[in-house]
């Protein structure tokens, strides 16, 4: 059986880049606790699909949805186009496209929008993965990997695109303030085939802990998205990242010292710190997750693809190296993959 391989990774962001001080001013917070969410986040800059010349914080639900649609199609299409180009493919070479997002929805679905924008074949197969939160890039990546295992001659692309700036909610909840302090916009795409030149995707795995179902997600008062984010997420998430890492390693006869690279979702400063503690990882092994958080913020599902791209750009992986790629999402769920260069 063919082992799927990563042929290329690409990312895209909105054209507008904001520093934390600017976003804090836009949020209107003036109490020390909420201001601290911004200053203690480790984040320096974020890209947001918000034109500073026209944005106002009193958007209607319809205006939010339209901004999400424009941003998701624009940024998602850019990421897919770059991944296809980096893989050395033509647009008509793509046999399968998987799209995913949790910050908005459109019908016809996001995959149909991108197929039209890029002029992909009319026979391209596709699937859209929705509402699996920050872990959804890994869920979509698994669908693409499974497709390539079943059809080894096919060339497939996964794209995770999030416009988190279209999911803000102005109220007095601390959860909302945390969301405003960390979430950002971006898209990450991965091209996968049976003959790619990048790392092999050796195994995918999912772990659910339904007792934490309400710890993270969205609710929709008045039709407007509002983040649900329990303070327990950093504890739950770190523990589940370790559980996922242990499961992937044990199933393949590996130990922590055998893993050369950790591609971990940049959920937030405290989550990264807690992961380092429970998994006994030094700063060097968390460097790419920290760097992405610092420069881009938490882009929900797209973030882990940015971390993978950051690692690949560093040139650190060598033939024979093992890597773990793990993200967290509502459910509560950990989604992971074992990679081999």
Where are these regions (language model features)?
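Condensing-enzyme catalytic core mediating Claisen C-C bond formation in acyl metabolism
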Residues: 1-70, 170-239, 243-247, 328, ...
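Short acidic, glycine/serine/threonine-rich loops at helix termini
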Residues: 18, 108-112, 139-142, 167-172, ...
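Claisen-condensing/thiolase-fold acyl-transfer catalytic domains that form or cleave C-C bonds
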Residues: 103, 116, 121-123, 128-152, ...
């Amino acid at each position: 059986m063919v082992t799927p391989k990563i042929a290329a990774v690409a990312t895209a962001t909105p054209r507008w880049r904001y520093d934390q001080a600017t976003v804090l001013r836009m949020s209107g917070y003036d109490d020390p606790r909420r201001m601290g969410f911004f200053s203690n986040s480790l984040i320096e800059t974020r890209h947001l699909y918000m034109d500073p010349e026209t944005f106002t914080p009193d958007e209607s639900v319809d205006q939010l949805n339209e901004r999400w649609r424009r941003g998701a199609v624009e940024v998602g299409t850019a990421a897919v186009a770059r991944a296809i180009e980096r893989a050395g493919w033509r647009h008509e070479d793509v046999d399968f496209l998987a799209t995913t997002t949790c910050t908005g929805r459109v019908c016809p679905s996001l995959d149909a929008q991108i197929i039209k924008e890029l002029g992909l074949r009319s026979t391209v197969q596709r699937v859209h993965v929705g509402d699996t939160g920050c872990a959804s890039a890994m869920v979509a990546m698994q669908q693409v990997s499974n497709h390539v295992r079943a059809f080894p001659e096919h060339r497939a692309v996964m794209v995770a695109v999030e416009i988190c700036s279209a999911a803000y909610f102005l109220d007095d909840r601390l959860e909302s303030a945390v969301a405003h302090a960390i979430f950002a916009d971006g898209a990450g795409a991965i091209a996968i085939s049976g003959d790619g030149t990048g790392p092999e995707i050796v195994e995918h795995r999912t772990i659910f802990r339904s007792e934490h179902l309400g710890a993270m997600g969205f609710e929709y008062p008045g039709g407007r998205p509002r983040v649900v984010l329990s303070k327990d997420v950093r504890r739950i998430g770190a523990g589940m990242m370790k559980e996922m890492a242990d499961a992937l390693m044990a199933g393949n006869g590996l130990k922590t010292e055998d893993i050369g690279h950790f591609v971990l979702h940049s959920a937030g400063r405290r989550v990264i710190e807690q992961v380092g503690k429970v998994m006994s990882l030094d700063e060097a092994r968390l460097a790419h997750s920290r760097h992405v958080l610092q420069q881009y913020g938490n882009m929900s599902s797209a973030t882990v693809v940015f971390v993978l791209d950051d690692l690949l750009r560093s040139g650190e992986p060598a033939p024979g190296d093992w890597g773990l790629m793990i993200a967290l999402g509502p459910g509560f769920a950990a989604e992971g993959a074992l990679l081999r260069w």
